[in-house]
């Protein structure tokens, strides 16, 4: 029998979301959507399944990180591991003749293979919400994205967060003097914040010192910017970074500059950033000015920048609210006798024009009906008589809500 096998469980890395969890997620998405739209962003929905080549973004994403399959014609396909590549592909083809800049937002699930041990991978499904701004370069576009991110974090109710801000172009300029072989080792140490490796690894001394120098470029803008000014980096990029920090601080965004911030995706070309709360990443993103040309039939270039929020992490960090306990249903309509069913249906239809209403469908006693309403956090019961008259009684909630969101019998 099927119930005797493991087939009834989702695969490792995937899970069911029960009604109350879905309700919290939908409320979070609605809060984010409201902020996205206030900035002029429009929703885009791209396929979950894309040609593998599209998803790899010119080699920026490792093939083994993508869940792959083959269609009936032998074409290699993949489940999207992130949204940016698919959205830029759509922008460079379907939206190429439209007005710029493009302001697009998304909500949806992504899939990745994560390495567990050498040669072993596990698949994971998780959710992302985010935006892409395509066709606008410069520090002012960077500022819009970061201020939008700040407004999103505020809208969902988190206050004690920090923006870690780096710039790939500045970090790359410091690494340019390092040989390619040593550069790979230094990058790995920087990405893992591994001071011990940098001190002990058999590296040229110049490469070691540059790696340690980059790891040391982390702190408040007023501390890091003067240090950067003494190094061989672009004065224009440094000026833009200073202006960006000033704008963010004027909006009460807590900024930590971090030149060791190297995102795992290789398509970033300018600023990169993470929003963190208590050491947990709740959002990340950056500028990708060379990605558009990979998908443009005419090989046209357009700058781009975006971020993704991590709803699963946000929901874990956000405290429960009274709204989380309610099903959303405002009233339960109960025909007391069969002759009252037509009137009960009419009442439910009328009230549903403005609110959520349930109809009692089972042959239960008044005590069982009240217990059901309590478990589901339905505030009122309308008891309908045979002649169509009714009375409404409030429901009290002495017991805690069912955490599964399921209102059936225990």
UniProtKB/Swiss-Prot annotation:
One GO BP annotation of this record: histidyl-tRNA aminoacylation
InterPro entries on file: aa-tRNA-synth_II, aa-tRNA-synth_II/BPL/LPL, HisRS-like_core, HisRS/HisZ, HisZ
Superkingdom classification of source: Bacteria
Keywords, sorted A to Z: Amino-acid biosynthesis, Cytoplasm, Histidine biosynthesis
Pfam families documented for this protein: tRNA-synt_His (PF13393)
A GO cellular component annotation in the UniProt record: cytoplasm
Recorded metabolic or biological pathway in which this protein acts: Amino-acid biosynthesis; L-histidine biosynthesis; L-histidine from 5-phospho-alpha-D-ribose 1-diphosphate: step 1/9
Localization, UniProt: Cytoplasm
Principal location: cytoplasm
Any one GO MF annotation of this record: histidine-tRNA ligase activity
Other remarks in the entry: This function is generally fulfilled by the C-terminal part of HisG, which is missing in some bacteria such as this one.
UniProt family annotation: Belongs to the class-II aminoacyl-tRNA synthetase family. HisZ subfamily.
Function field: Required for the first step of histidine biosynthesis. May allow the feedback regulation of ATP phosphoribosyltransferase activity by histidine.
Quaternary structure (record): Heteromultimer composed of HisG and HisZ subunits.
Protein name per its UniProtKB record: ATP phosphoribosyltransferase regulatory subunit
Organism (species): Synechococcus sp. (strain JA-3-3Ab)
Gene it is expressed from: hisZ
């Amino acid at each position: 029998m099927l119930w005797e096998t493991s087939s009834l469980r989702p695969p490792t890395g995937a899970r069911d979301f029960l009604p109350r969890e879905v309700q919290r997620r939908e409320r979070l998405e609605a809060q984010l959507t409201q902020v996205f739209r206030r900035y002029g962003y429009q929703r885009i929905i791209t396929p979950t399944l894309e040609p593998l080549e599209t998803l790899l973004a010119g080699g920026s994403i490792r093939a083994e990180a993508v869940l792959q399959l083959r269609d009936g014609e032998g074409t290699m396909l993949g489940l999207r591991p992130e949204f940016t590549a698919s959205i830029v592909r759509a922008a460079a083809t379907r939206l190429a003749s439209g007005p710029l800049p493009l302001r697009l937002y998304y909500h949806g699930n992504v899939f990745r293979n994560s390495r567990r041990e050498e040669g072993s991978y596990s698949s994971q499904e998780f959710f992302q919400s985010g935006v892409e701004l395509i066709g606008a370069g410069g520090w002012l576009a960077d500022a819009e994205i970061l201020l939008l991110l700040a407004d999103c974090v505020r809208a969902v109710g988190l206050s004690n967060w920090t923006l870690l801000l780096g710039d790939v172009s500045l970090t790359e300029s410091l690494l340019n003097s390092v040989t390619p072989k040593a550069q790979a080792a230094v990058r790995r140490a920087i990405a893992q914040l591994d001071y011990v490796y940098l001190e002990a690894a058999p590296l040229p001394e110049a490469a070691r010192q540059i790696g340690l120098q980059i790891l040391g470029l982390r702190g408040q803008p007023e501390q890091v910017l003067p240090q950067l000014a003494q190094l061989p980096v672009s004065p224009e990029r440094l000026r833009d970074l200073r202006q960006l920090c000033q704008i963010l601080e004027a909006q009460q965004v807590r900024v930590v500059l971090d030149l060791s911030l190297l995102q795992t995706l290789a398509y970033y070309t300018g600023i990169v950033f993470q929003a963190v709360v208590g050491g947990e990443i709740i959002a990340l993103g950056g500028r990708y000015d060379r990605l558009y040309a990979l998908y443009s039939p005419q090989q046209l270039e357009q700058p781009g920048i975006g971020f993704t929020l991590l709803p699963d992490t946000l929901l874990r960090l956000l405290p429960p609210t009274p709204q989380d306990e309610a099903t959303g249903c405002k009233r339960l309509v109960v025909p007391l006798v069969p002759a009252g069913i037509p009137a009960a249906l009419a009442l439910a239809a009328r009230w549903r024009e403005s609110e959520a209403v349930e109809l009692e469908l089972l042959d239960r006693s008044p005590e069982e009906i009240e217990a059901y309403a309590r478990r589901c956090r339905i505030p009122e019961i309308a008891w309908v008589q045979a002649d169509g008259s009714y009375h409404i009684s409030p429901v009290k909630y002495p017991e805690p809500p069912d955490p599964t969101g399921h209102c059936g019998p225990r």
